[in-house]
A protein has these predicted regions:
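Low-complexity or membrane-interfacial segments used for flexible interactions
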Residues: 1-66, 70-77, 82-90, 96-101, ...
Length: 203
């Protein structure tokens, strides 16, 4: 689907729009690049006109939305669907034909961020947590062994202060990760940004 199988590191870079500089929330768009800055694809939230814009301002990351993921040839290959939820957010990943690949499911936790990566049958493939002493680091574990990691990178003082522009390093630490698992880890980076770093409704 995306050229991820032979990659050790992938960067997900959020692209900001003018409205973000004045505190006005705009749709999410991301570049997906390798560690040399070569584009592997991109992802973009689908705008739903004026109603979508209003819901974004009122509901933030609780709202229903779709993110389309494209390959290097700008062909839509995946869709990440976020259903409306106030609690325990979820991101469902499927092919453009509608075949489910898996999901990212938030779990209850007191002092740290926690979610699971599920396969198409709802079975847990990877467990993910962010240590309380590393709030920008998310470790992906399979059977008590770390196999991947997503880390939020510093975007610069001005961008951090005035916009939601976030950059993430996705590290595939286990060469045995399947193509499906790599796609889900990449999708989890989008989930992390939307859930933990996007401005919440009303702010």
């Amino acid at each position: 689907v995306l050229a991820l199988v032979d990659r050790k590191n992938v960067f997900v870079r959020q692209v900001h729009e003018l409205g973000e500089w004045v505190g006005f929330e705009t749709r999410n768009k991301y570049q997906i690049q390798d560690d040399k800055g070569i584009d592997l694809g991109f992802a973009a939230e689908q705008q739903k006109g004026l109603l979508g814009l209003i819901l974004r301002q009122l509901l933030g990351h609780w709202r229903t939305f779709d993110i389309y993921i494209y390959d290097q040839a700008r062909q839509n290959v995946l869709i990440a669907h976020h259903p409306f939820r106030f609690f325990f957010q979820r991101l469902e990943i499927r092919t453009k034909e509608g075949n489910p690949l898996g999901a990212i499911q938030q779990r209850f936790a007191f002092f740290h961020k926690r979610f699971d990566v599920e396969n198409a049958k709802g079975q847990v493939l990877l467990e993910v947590a962010s240590p309380i002493w590393k709030i920008w680091t998310f470790q992906f574990r399979k059977k008590d062994r770390q196999v991947a990691q997503v880390t939020k990178k510093w975007s610069g003082l001005l961008a951090e202060a005035l916009t939601d522009k976030d950059n993430f390093l996705v590290e595939f630490q286990d060469a045995g990760l399947t193509a499906e698992e790599r796609v889900l880890v990449l999708s989890a980076a989008l989930f992390i940004d939307l859930q933990y770093f996007e401005r919440k409704a009303g702010k």
